[in-house]
Amino acid sequence: MIALTWRSGLRIGEVLALKPKDVDLDSGTLVVQHGKGNKRRVVGLDAGTTALLQRWLDVRAKHGVARRATVFCTLRGGSIDQSYVRHLLPRLAASAGIEKRVHAHALRHAYATELEREGAPISTIRDLLGHSSAAVTDRYLRRLGAGEAVEFARQRTWALDAV
């Protein structure tokens, strides 16, 4: 669930709402049926995420979880609440020795930032995140990049001798 949230850029509510019928492992895609604003979108998955998702679906099947249950559920098919995930992530981060604040939406931010660093056009990032416009995505990325911009400015040199 955590890897999918990070590697797909989905909101935690979108991840928890996924049904097995929304996942196409052969094509490496999943469908968000009701994203923010009740919008539907298709998201691609990299091979590593697809493999992890396949492993989880195999575990579900092994435990007899009904196909009508959401992809991420209890082993009895019960739903997982967003608040559970919100409390789980900081605990997992602490046990991994991560001191920085960790929250579900930070995984979405990391996904967007990584796509930008890998050279994805802002229109592609917008579509994958399900944003209504590139301006929303740009604000999203600029807010994330503020620390980098400050660090870049701090590292600049000014050679007064050349003046």
What is the meaning of each model-derived region?
Residues 35-55, 68-90:
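C-terminal catalytic core of Y-nucleophile DNA break-rejoin enzymes
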Residues 34, 129-154:
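Catalytic-site neighborhood detector that most strongly recognizes the C-terminal catalytic loop/helix
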Residues 23-25, 81, 99-101, 120-141:
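Short, polar N-cap/turn motifs at the start of nucleic acid-interacting alpha helices
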Residues 5, 16, 126:
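The alpha-helix within a helix-turn-helix
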Residues 8, 12-13, 17-58:
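Conserved tyrosine-mediated DNA breakage-rejoining catalytic core shared by Y-recombinases
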Residues 155-163:
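C-terminal secondary-structure termini that scaffold catalytic or DNA-interacting sites
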Residues 43, 86-127:
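Short, basic (Lys/Arg/His-rich) helix/loop patches that form interaction surfaces
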Residues 1, 5, 115-116:
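Short helix-to-turn junction characteristic of helix-turn-helix DNA-binding domains
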